[in-house]
Amino acid sequence: ENDRTLTFPRKSLEALAPDGFLGLMLPKEWGGLGQNHVMYAAVTETIARHGDASCAMCYVMHIGAVEALKLRATEYTIEKYLKKVKEGLIGTLSYSDPETGSHFWYPIASGARAVDGGYEVLKKASWTTSAGFADFYVLQTTSPDYNGDYSNLSVFVVDKDEIEAKPQEWDAMGLRGNQSGTLLLDWKFVPGEQLVGPIGDGANSNDEAVDPYFLIGSSGCWNGISLGAIDIAIRHTTVKKHKDVGMRVCDYPTIQDAVGEAIMDTNASRTFVFSVASALDKVTDGAQTNPAIGDLARGNYLHWLWQIKFNAAKNVAYVVDKMLHCCGGTGFKKEPLQLERYLRDGKAGWVMGPTNEVLRQFVGKTALLGMESLDYWNVSINERALNNELKKFSPDQKRELADRLIAEAGNNGASA
């Protein structure tokens, strides 16, 4: 129904609250379950497999927001937000930017300025899951003192009544219930207590909380969709008969091969996710401790976290496609199997930022050239490329370029 009517899965999310699942990894004294990263991956997988992938993705973003607050928890945020998630308070993350696409770490269109008692914050987001429906929003902007340094980021938490959202703009191929519409916080006042962590902490908290929880949770979601599609194919092919040859569809070796490969590939992806989640558990006491500001625990595993997302998103596209082949024309219809919904939902995995193209390059580039080669904020000079291009210049072109650079340097010095 959520898929057909573009309905936000509020009821499904609220159903998770009484048993503590909205605070899955929060301490029990805050109303949480005190669980770990492995359980988190299993929960998102289960919701996507047996329920609704839109709900699973909204849950992932909610957990990301909750854990970003927990990473830099204060008495204020504990009482106002974290202890209330058991009552059905739903959060989300808003990290995208209309100017930089899936490069969500580079918020060109956002900003903040310090004022008495807090900050005035501008946040423009091209995609925000649960936009207009979540109760609180953890968002990232450049810091008040960023001075052109886009690595100087800060994080704020704001309430629903402060933001402007346009959920009616969301009409996507899949994940149709998650309402990933645009969001605007138009230089609204945000009290100082709602700064999450210190000024300039955004890049560190992104690596330590936002990225790890998104990548673990979304990978679980894609694996859950794969498992759900396999479930559907097994149920259908074991009862569908071809009376002319006296065989069920599952009796054909080609169907057995396809299902077998799908199971093996999906279980390999699941094992990879649970393995990385277990590694995170070991360095955080089962998600119950966090490193000091400026240090990393989960963030040291980014290279592996990128890989699990790439693998799960790649696998789900292949698996659901093959299960559709196994189910034939019946699978192509919306009813009765609903396999086509799994196919559409699974397509989101590849394009959800960081996209698989970005992740593939990240992994390869860092393996070959080191993490510093990524240059997230486009500040490193590629001297090799620069010197190579200069060799192509004629003497006159070099003089022209030199004159221009000297003039620019003079202008910059005067303005400074």
Stretches with model-predicted labels:
Residues K124-K166:
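A short core secondary-structure module
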